[in-house]
């Protein structure tokens, strides 16, 4: 069984994901992690010995409508990329821990019929 965890931006999203990863691995479940290439997860996840897959994602500023266009384009692009990745690794489930990167990853899983769990602790 393989489970993909996803989250990004702050340690508040990453630390709970790493705790779940530890428990899953103790039970023999393979874990992969989807995050942003510039967030704290890009350092913490590999340091924990978990395979890391980067996806682009960003928030938007309501005062600057073009930032919404950029964010939506990134969601669309990263959703397609996540679907390609899922086709290769065939995860049994996806768990989203928050952060903008969780949107395209969960969306791709839902579109492919992969069970999605959302754990937003804050």
Model-derived features with residue positions:
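Conserved nucleotide-sugar phosphate-binding/catalytic loop shared by glycosyltransferases and other
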Residues: 2-7, 26-84
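Structural detector of well-ordered beta-strand residues that form the stable sheet scaffold
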Residues: 4, 32, 94-95, 117
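Hydrophobic alpha-helical packing residues
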Residues: 24-25, 109
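Active-site-proximal region of nucleotide-activated glycan assembly enzymes
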Residues: 30, 40, 51, 111-122
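Short beta->alpha connector loops at strand-helix junctions that form conserved
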Residues: 54-58, 97-98, 118-122
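Glycosyltransferases and closely related glycan-assembly transferases
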Residues: 81-94, 102-117
């Amino acid at each position: 069984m393989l489970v993909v965890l996803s989250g990004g931006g702050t340690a508040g999203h990453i630390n709970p994901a790493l705790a779940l990863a530890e428990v899953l691995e103790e039970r023999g479940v393979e874990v992969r992690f989807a995050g942003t290439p510039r967030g704290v997860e890009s350092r913490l996840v590999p340091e924990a010995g978990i395979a890391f897959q980067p996806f682009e994602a960003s928030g938007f500023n309501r005062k600057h409508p073009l930032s919404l266009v950029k964010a939506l384009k990134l969601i669309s692009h990263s959703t397609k990329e996540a679907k390609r990745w899922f086709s290769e690794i065939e995860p049994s489930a996806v768990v989203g821990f928050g952060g903008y990167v969780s949107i395209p990853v969960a969306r791709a899983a839902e579109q492919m019929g992969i069970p999605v769990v959302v754990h937003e602790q804050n």
